Amino acid sequence: AGASVCHVDASKGMTAWAKENAALCGISDIRFIVDDCIKFVSREIRRGRKYDGIIMDPPSYGRGPGGEVWKLENELYSLLTLCLDVMSEKPLFFLLNSYTTGLSASCMEYMLGVTVARRFGGKVTASEIGLPVERSGYILPCGASARWER
């Protein structure tokens, strides 16, 4: 309904998989970019492009082309702060998803609160992601998600 979507991932394989999934769903108007997200966002800021929403599912760990180490728990705050400058004046949402064991739902809620909510108002909610274990009825925790909305 008038929205445009841009998918950015440094992995060619993940991007190819996302393209395949979009095609299977009959969605053809997605801009797919294979690039480092930090470099991409920095370029978008210089170009003056703005986004009304961001869905972020960053990796827990990675290595750059020069062997530099990237760990989400060390880099998330700076990534969120960078993304503030690519968001429109009245953004609608920011979704953050992670399977990083050292990053709890409450930590993600706090990070969105002190970055996105501090700048744009709105509210932040977070929850644990889990898989139900049929035999015991318990939930096996496997990640967390947080959402900011206006």
Describe the function of each predicted region.
Residues 3, 26-30, 120-122:
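A short helix-to-beta-strand connector/capping loop
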Residues 4-9:
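Conserved SAM-binding motif I beta-strand of class I
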Residues 10-55:
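S-adenosyl-L-methionine
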Residues 12-14, 34, 51-82:
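Mobile active-site "lid"/loop adjacent to the S-adenosyl-L-methionine
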Residues 20, 39, 78-85:
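Alpha-helical scaffolding segments of alpha/beta enzyme cores, especially the outer helices
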Residues 43-45, 65-67, 106-107:
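Short, well-ordered secondary-structure micro-motifs
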Residues 87-89:
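Helix-to-beta-strand junctions that scaffold the AdoMet/dcAdoMet cofactor pocket
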Residues 91-150:
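C-terminal catalytic and target-recognition region of SAM-dependent MTase-like enzymes
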